[in-house]
Amino acid sequence: MGKRNLDETMNESTVSEANGDATAPTTEKDEYQALCELVNPIAQPLANRKLAKKVYKLIKKASAGDKTLREGIKDVQKELRRNEKGICILAGNVSPIDVYSHIPGICEEKEIPYVYIPSREQLGLAVGHRRPSILIFVKPSGDFKELYDEVAEALRHLTVEAA
């Protein structure tokens, strides 16, 4: 049997198109609606499209700053224990729910506004990496104070719908 000579070079553009890689979170109407249908039962209050877009923008600005954004359950719990002021953003499609089901109770107890976003993948993209993120805590900063106040005020007016 003869040896085969294989060309193992790949075109990078075809790989990224095939994987469906995205570089920014999307809030397109149809896609956002599809993501909202996949959330778990405790994901209340769920951000609407307009609010989600503002939240993604806030996360993007906070991730550029130093120590204004905390990511992950361990870091967010630490910030909540320290009574830090901020906004808590949770992903709505996390399974099992028990991983972070206690966080909304802590946020309500400490009067910290919180909101659910439909997709953990979109939340990770908003931070600036491809890794999904289930929980983010954004602290106020002078760089994005106006946007922070606008989002915090909108979150204070959200209500949890009874099932």
UniProtKB/Swiss-Prot annotation:
<keyword id="KW-0690">Ribosome biogenesis</keyword>
<comment type="function">
    <text>Required for ribosome biogenesis. Part of a complex which catalyzes pseudouridylation of rRNA. This involves the isomerization of uridine such that the ribose is subsequently attached to C5, instead of the normal N1. Pseudouridine ('psi') residues may serve to stabilize the conformation of rRNAs.</text>
</comment>
<comment type="subunit">
    <text>Component of the small nucleolar ribonucleoprotein particle containing H/ACA-type snoRNAs (H/ACA snoRNPs).</text>
</comment>
<dbReference type="InterPro" id="IPR004038">
    <property type="entry name" value="Ribosomal_eL8/eL30/eS12/Gad45"/>
</dbReference>
<dbReference type="InterPro" id="IPR050257">
    <property type="entry name" value="eL8/uL1-like"/>
</dbReference>
<dbReference type="InterPro" id="IPR002415">
    <property type="entry name" value="H/ACA_rnp_Nhp2-like"/>
</dbReference>
<protein>
    <recommendedName>
        <fullName>Putative H/ACA ribonucleoprotein complex subunit 2-like protein</fullName>
    </recommendedName>
</protein>
<dbReference type="GO" id="GO:0031118">
    <property type="term" value="P:rRNA pseudouridine synthesis"/>
</dbReference>
<dbReference type="GO" id="GO:0034513">
    <property type="term" value="F:box H/ACA snoRNA binding"/>
</dbReference>
<dbReference type="GO" id="GO:0005732">
    <property type="term" value="C:sno(s)RNA-containing ribonucleoprotein complex"/>
</dbReference>
<comment type="similarity">
    <text>Belongs to the eukaryotic ribosomal protein eL8 family.</text>
</comment>
<dbReference type="InterPro" id="IPR004037">
    <property type="entry name" value="Ribosomal_eL8-like_CS"/>
</dbReference>
<dbReference type="GO" id="GO:0031429">
    <property type="term" value="C:box H/ACA snoRNP complex"/>
</dbReference>
<keyword id="KW-0539">Nucleus</keyword>
<dbReference type="InterPro" id="IPR018492">
    <property type="entry name" value="Ribosomal_eL8/Nhp2"/>
</dbReference>
<dbReference type="InterPro" id="IPR029064">
    <property type="entry name" value="Ribosomal_eL30-like_sf"/>
</dbReference>
<dbReference type="Pfam" id="PF01248">
    <property type="entry name" value="Ribosomal_L7Ae"/>
</dbReference>
<keyword id="KW-0687">Ribonucleoprotein</keyword>
<keyword id="KW-0694">RNA-binding</keyword>
<keyword id="KW-0698">rRNA processing</keyword>
<feature type="region of interest" description="Disordered">
    <location>
        <begin position="1"/>
        <end position="27"/>
    </location>
</feature>
<dbReference type="GO" id="GO:0031120">
    <property type="term" value="P:snRNA pseudouridine synthesis"/>
</dbReference>
